[in-house]
């Protein structure tokens, strides 16, 4: 883990842009665009409250970041659904694996970012018909999904991967119940 966390938040443009280093006051000020999965994982380690560890450099694509005046304020990482074989048309879906927001990001950053990413994925990936995300009910109420126009599709009780799982040795990151939210493209 990078010990000098502030430095990885800087976008590092080729030329310094104008601006006084102010903090954005509205999510409308944030520019949302794609970043590398490696950069997204580093930022996730800084900001994610419950699941900072994620090692999916080759799996998570696309990854997005929200930035203002060359400073990152949020990231989101997408992949094919982990349980695509259990979902109807799972191969035509993308799962939001992680979304992490800096403490100094403007209010409503998450719902704005969801809305913009939805539009970008729709345009760039016509093969994707549905977006899904699993809400950890232990720490989230689902407000960001509702505000972005997503629908709660399934509520599930916590289940362990179990000792007979195809994922032996996996660390249980959260034992809370989950809500699967969906957005049809």
Each language-model region and where it sits:
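An active-site-proximal beta-strand-loop segment
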Residues: 51-57, 61-62, 67, 83-85
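Acyl-donor-binding surface of acyltransferase catalytic domains
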Residues: 1-15
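Conserved beta-hairpin
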Residues: 44, 59-77
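Short hydrophobic/aromatic beta-strand or adjacent loop that forms the aromatic wall/cage
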Residues: 61, 176-180
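Short amphipathic alpha-helix that is part of the acyltransferase structural core
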Residues: 12-58
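Short acidic/polar alpha-helix capping motifs at helix-coil junctions
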Residues: 5-7, 26-27, 107-110
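Short beta-strand-to-coil "C-cap" segments at the C-terminal boundary of structured domains/repeats
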Residues: 182-185
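Acyl-donor binding region in acyl/amide transferases
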Residues: 31-35, 75, 79-177
């Amino acid at each position: 883990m990078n010990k000098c966390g502030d430095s990885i938040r800087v976008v590092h443009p080729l030329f310094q842009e104008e601006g006084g280093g102010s903090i954005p006051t509205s999510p409308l000020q944030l520019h949302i665009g794609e970043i590398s999965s490696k950069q997204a994982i580093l930022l996730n380690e800084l900001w994610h409250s419950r699941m900072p560890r994620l090692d999916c450099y080759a799996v998570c694509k696309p990854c997005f970041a929200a930035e203002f005046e060359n400073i990152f304020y949020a990231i989101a990482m997408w992949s094919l659904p982990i349980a695509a074989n259990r979902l109807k048309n799972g191969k035509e879906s993308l799962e939001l694996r992680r979304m992490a927001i800096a403490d100094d990001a403007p209010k409503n950053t998450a719902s704005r970012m969801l809305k913009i990413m939805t539009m970008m994925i729709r345009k760039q990936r016509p093969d994707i018909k549905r977006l899904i995300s699993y809400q950890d009910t232990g720490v989230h109420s689902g407000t960001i999904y509702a505000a972005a126009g997503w629908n709660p599709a399934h509520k599930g009780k916590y289940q362990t991967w179990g000792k007979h799982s195809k994922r032996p040795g996996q660390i249980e990151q959260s034992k809370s119940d989950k809500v699967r939210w969906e957005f049809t493209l």
